Amino acid sequence: MIGRLRGIVLEKQPPLVLLETNGVGYEVHMPMTCFYELPDAGQEAVLFTHFVVREDAQLLYGFNDKQERALFRELIKVNGVGPKLALAILSGMSAQQFVSAIEREAIVSLVKLPGVGKKTAERLVVEMKDRFKGLNGDLFNQSSDINLPATAKQTTSDADSEAEAAAALVSLGYKPQEASRMVSKIAKPGADCETLIREALRAVL
C-alpha cells in the first residue's frame, strides 16, 4: 500500500494533483480543504495517502496530515459512504467543521453537502460520533477558516477559472447546472479557480 508520497507538484487540476516522485507521476485525488494548502507547481509537497483498488481502477487519495486521512478512513467505513462521497464531504467541510457538525448532530448542515441526504446525514451522526474518541491530535485544533497559500497566482482568464471551478464541483458530486449556478453567484473578476471553489462551497453551508 502507498501510504505517503513526497515529490514535486507538476499539475494542479482540482480536485486532482499530479505529483512526481522518482520520475513517476502519481495522480492523487484530494479533498478541496486539503487541496487549497498545496504549494504551487514546481514546489515540493508531502501527502499522506490512501490507496483504493477497484475492478476498473487504482486510485490514490491524498491528505496533508495523518489525522485527515484517518477521518477519511473512518468515513468510508460508514454504510453507504464510498471514497467519492467521503471526498465530497471533506471538500465541503474541513475536518474540524465535520467533527463539530457530527458532535452537534447538525443534520441541517450535513444535508447541504453533495450526495448527503437526510438518511445519510443521520447515519453519519449515529456511526461517527463515538469514533472520534480514537482520533486525536491536530484534527481537533485546526482553524475552521481555510486560507489559500499567499503564493497563489491568477494565470488564466476569468472564464477559464469559472469553468475549471464548475468542473471541479461536478467531480465532487454536484450537478452541472447546480455547479455553474454556484460559481456564478460568487464569481469575482480576477478570482482564481481555487478561490472560486472555496467560496462556492462556503456559500452553500
UniProtKB/Swiss-Prot annotation:
Give the GO terms filed under biological process for this record: DNA recombination; DNA repair
Alphabetized Pfam families for the sequence: HHH_5 (PF14520), RuvA_C (PF07499), RuvA_N (PF01330)
The listed locations are: Cytoplasm
List GO molecular-function terms, semicolon-separated: ATP binding; four-way junction DNA binding; four-way junction helicase activity
In residue numbers, the region (Domain III) covers 157-205
Q: Where is this region: Flexible linker?
A: 144-156
> What InterPro entries does the database record attribute to this sequence?
DNA_helicase_Holl-junc_RuvA_I (IPR013849), Hlx-hairpin-Hlx_DNA-bd_motif (IPR003583), NA-bd_OB-fold (IPR012340), RuvA (IPR000085), RuvA_2-like (IPR010994), RuvA_C (IPR011114), RuvA_C_sf (IPR036267)
**Which UniProt keywords are listed?**
Cytoplasm, DNA damage, DNA recombination, DNA repair, DNA-binding
Q: Where is this region: Domain I?
A: 1-64
- Please provide, in alphabetical order, the Gene Ontology terms of the cellular component aspect for this entry: cytoplasm; Holliday junction helicase complex; Holliday junction resolvase complex
Say if the entry is tagged with keyword DNA damage: yes
Q: Which domain of life is it from?
A: Bacteria
Region annotation Domain II: where it falls in the sequence? 65-143
Stated family: Belongs to the RuvA family.
Share what the entry says about its subunit structure, partners included: Homotetramer. Forms an RuvA(8)-RuvB(12)-Holliday junction (HJ) complex. HJ DNA is sandwiched between 2 RuvA tetramers; dsDNA enters through RuvA and exits via RuvB. An RuvB hexamer assembles on each DNA strand where it exits the tetramer. Each RuvB hexamer is contacted by two RuvA subunits (via domain III) on 2 adjacent RuvB subunits; this complex drives branch migration. In the full resolvosome a probable DNA-RuvA(4)-RuvB(12)-RuvC(2) complex forms which resolves the HJ.
Function text: The RuvA-RuvB-RuvC complex processes Holliday junction (HJ) DNA during genetic recombination and DNA repair, while the RuvA-RuvB complex plays an important role in the rescue of blocked DNA replication forks via replication fork reversal (RFR). RuvA specifically binds to HJ cruciform DNA, conferring on it an open structure. The RuvB hexamer acts as an ATP-dependent pump, pulling dsDNA into and through the RuvAB complex. HJ branch migration allows RuvC to scan DNA until it finds its consensus sequence, where it cleaves and resolves the cruciform DNA.
Q: What is known of its domains?
A: Has three domains with a flexible linker between the domains II and III and assumes an 'L' shape. Domain III is highly mobile and contacts RuvB.
Q: What protein does this entry describe?
A: Holliday junction branch migration complex subunit RuvA
> Which organism encodes this protein?
Photorhabdus laumondii subsp. laumondii (strain DSM 15139 / CIP 105565 / TT01)
